Structures are given as C-alpha cells and as structure tokens.
Amino acid sequence: MLRIAICDDDAGERTRITEDLRAYADAHSEHGITCTAYPSAFAMLDAFEKTGCPDVALLDVCMPGMLGTELAREILRCSASTDIIFLTASSDYAVDAFSLHAADYIQKPYTREKFS
C-alpha cells in the first residue's frame, strides 16, 4: 500500500491533484495507492498523529499558518523515509526545499503532465 498525502490551502488545486492521483490509482490498482487531501498543515499533522506519516507528501509551499517547508520538517521528524514533493507558484523557496532533500519541486499552475 502506497499512502499519498496532499496539503494545499487552495481548494481547486487540492481537488485537481487529488482527482488526478485517484484516477491514476484506479487505473493501477495493483499498486494499492491511497490519496488523502488536507486543507492546512495543521489538519495534516493532526491526522498523522492518529494514522502515522504517509509514504509520499505533496505539499504546497506557501500556505497560511505554516509554510510547506516547515511542514516537511515536521513530517521528516515523524518519518525520514517519507518522500516530499513541493508544489508552488514561487521559486523563492527552492533552495530551502532541496535542502530538505525533496524528491521534486513542481511549479504551479499544476498540470497532470508535470507528474509524469
């Protein structure tokens, strides 16, 4: 089972990403992929206290309350094996993101092709 968590404060982006990942998961059911989306870093961290950290976390960088880079640090404290992928419209945080050994840094606007 591959657990993917998405955190983006933009409901439209969160919905598009979640729908695309779920469509991929349905088409590749042999991989056992589950996707869960969260509207804020705090909602994601609260859930992880109950369920544990995901295998992959797709994080918006610029969110109110807590930056995605800060959220990544918290996730990596919980599980150093979680792959982090940042999604952002800004390249200002690229150095910080890669210092966290991010698996990828995808620039918004999000398109399905950017995940391939």
Enumerate the predicted regions with their spans:
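Switch/coupling loops of ABC transporter nucleotide-binding domains
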Residues: L2, I33, T82
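Cofactor-binding loop segments of dinucleotide-utilizing enzymes, especially the Rossmann-like FAD-
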Residues: D9, S40, A89
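CheY-like receiver
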Residues: L45-D46, T51-S116
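Short helix-capping segments at alpha-helix termini
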Residues: A25-E30, C78-A80
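Conserved SAM-binding loop
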Residues: I6, A37, F86-L87
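Short, well-ordered amphipathic alpha-helices
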Residues: T15-A25, M44-L45, A72
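Conserved acidic segment of CheY-like receiver
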Residues: L2-R22, A57
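Short hydrophobic/Thr-rich beta-strand motif most characteristic of the beta2 strand and flanking loop
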Residues: A27-S40, A47
